[in-house]
Amino acid sequence: MPIEMRSFARSVMNDDERREVEAMEMLADHLRDELVEREVAINQAHVVGAQSTAIQAIVAEVLTDELDFGQEVVLTPQDGIVTRARPDFVFQLSPGRGVMAEVERGGTVNNNHDLKDMWKAYISQDIQHLFLVVPNSNWTGVGGAREKPYPRVINRVGAFFGTPRRESGRPVGPRLRVRAGQPASCG
């Protein structure tokens, strides 16, 4: 299956935010191109019972080695919020501005990992952008598709964008811009 990518951004942005989103486009396009190059390895790693760390290791080759993302970085804590958010990958755009990348697999939708990642990015003062890497399909033991996380993630994440009312609530900075690119699935 092809490696697809979908982007969501706030409906209203100023010029600085637009420029930052353009920089995210370039990062995301590079990530997608590199994942396409690794499609065979991704398909071999994305099998029944595999851990998300198998896919994460492949994505890490691109994010850490080529794009200079940090791995498992603890984000700046905020007053009143009890969390030690530690995304899979983080890239600092400038002081206090960044993008985090999360790789999900089996629990993407069933365990709400996609929404947890949105929440983590939303409450993190250092993060304004989120790349989600999710599978097209997860498989049963006999090789059939058990679920299709990618289209469900697109629908769920897309619900947070499209109108200023749905995008409101964050006091500073642009709302999240989500890249949901997924590993191609096997089968």
Q: What positions do the PLM features span?
A:
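Active-site-adjacent loop/helix micro-motif of nuclease/hydrolase catalytic cores
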Residues: 100-103, 107-117, 142
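Domain-level recognition of nuclease-like catalytic cores that cleave nucleotide substrates
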Residues: 136-187
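Interdomain/boundary linker segments immediately adjacent to catalytic/signaling cores
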Residues: 1-77
